[in-house]
């Protein structure tokens, strides 16, 4: 089980926060389960972002399902629903909301790809490449993505888990850049 917890700034400034085990902790706002994956491992929630309306999104590394969490005015959870479940998105690692384009970019570590998710949950591919060492700037298991000006900066993890396109460790070419329009 993967979880998302919510803490006030006041609580954090007071020092160490001790959590209660399992679902007993009042800070717990969402939990997610993943079945054993087709890659032969267990994986869970990975990546978190918020849109311009204050909705929170997370993806599941193990199966690519994205969830959308909405909030009441007092900050409590209003809903936690599946936002995307698409055969074209089988792995969510880092995710980034681009306010200028009103889309979410997803690092698909399994397929060496960056996916684009529209606010109505449609998935398209921005970039995908074969298993490379990254020396030419191509992706080598992207794990985080962000947009800076007219560039998308991608951090590469380069960890050869079974079932991923990335099959071996390479020299540390850790960043890739895609020029945006």
Residue ranges and their predicted role:
Residues 1, 50, 56-62, 98, ...:
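Conserved beta-strand positions in repeat-built beta-propeller and related beta-rich domains
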Residues 1-27, 31, 57-63, 67:
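Surface loops at the rim/top face of extracytoplasmic beta-rich domains
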Residues 7-20, 69-76, 118-123, 179-181:
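Short loop/turn segments immediately following beta-strands, especially the blade-tip
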Residues 46-73, 77:
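Oxyanion-binding "anion nests"
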Residues 1, 26-55, 86-103, 133-149, ...:
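Beta-rich, blade/repeat-based domains predominating
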